[in-house]
Amino acid sequence: MQDIRIDSPLKGRLIPLSEVTDPAFASGAMGRGAAVADPEGRVVSPVDGEVTVLFATKHAIGIHSADGVDLLIHVGVDTVKLEGKHFTSHVAQGDTVQKGQLLLEFDPDAIRAEGYETTTPVLVTNAADYGKITFTLDGAE
């Protein structure tokens, strides 16, 4: 099996997925990955690929990379309940994106002020197709 490396789509502090407070993410049930704690408010594409899903609430985005990796970037925990408030999308579903391209912006202070965590899981949803998955903070620099 091929090993892969994923650069972080956000600036912040990289933490193990097991430290995310939502059990669906922490358990790995939604995919293998890592999370970014205390993120700044910009999400960039960690890969060249295509936007496969952009939630209407703009809190989560899926990307299929040019080399076959399926990623889900989910800003915060339970932030779907904000119904798009404090989020701005810079891409649409079906768009081709380049590594480093701005995807989403969000206001982490406003989200936290409304009582939501901003820790952002970054998941490989087709992780069974890969061996070791390494996450780095390189992409968000």
Regions from the PLM with identified roles:
Residues 1-141:
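Contiguous, well-folded functional domains in the mature portion of proteins
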